[in-house]
Amino acid sequence: SGKVINKLKDRMPNLIGGSADLAPSNKTNMSDAGDFSKADYAGRNMHFGVRELAMTAIGNGMMLHGGLRTYVSTFFVFSDYTKPMARLSALMKMPLTFVFTHDSIGVGEDGPTHEPIEQLAMFRAMPNFHVFRPCDATETAAAWYSAVTSKTTPTALVLSRQNLAPMPGSCKDALKGGYVIDDCEGTPDLILI
């Protein structure tokens, strides 16, 4: 995702975004884009602090103002704090992009307080809200493409903490949603969805 953001910043001069005090972990900093501040309104990296709700409200406001394409980011387990404003994004048909990271049981020593369980179901249940949980870098790039080309629908990119190996066949149908990555002959022993 971080590589995609840095490719997009060169093609989208109106791209601006940031994280709730987790940019190095979320990989959401745009290199050589400066930090938005009182001294530098041209900076494109926003530092929201530990304020997920305010971050999302600010992202909505920037999108409502027009002219900017905005993304916000935090750990997926903290997405609960973004929910009221994320719902307003959907209701207002505001195509804000959410980058939620660390969706994995491999999140490390922080234990269950940092393990998102119900958040994916919550966002998937929200009307007019796209949710992508890409399996690799190819699907992540496709999810970003869908997010930045959306005109009326907010998008959540739900990403793992770990680097993931490319999946064979993940490219062709990545924008379709669910699809078969690896089929078998005969009756399968297991179907993994």
Region roles according to the model:
Residues S1-V158, N163-A165, A174:
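Thiamine diphosphate
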Residues K151-T153, D173-I193:
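Long hydrophobic segments that form regular secondary structure
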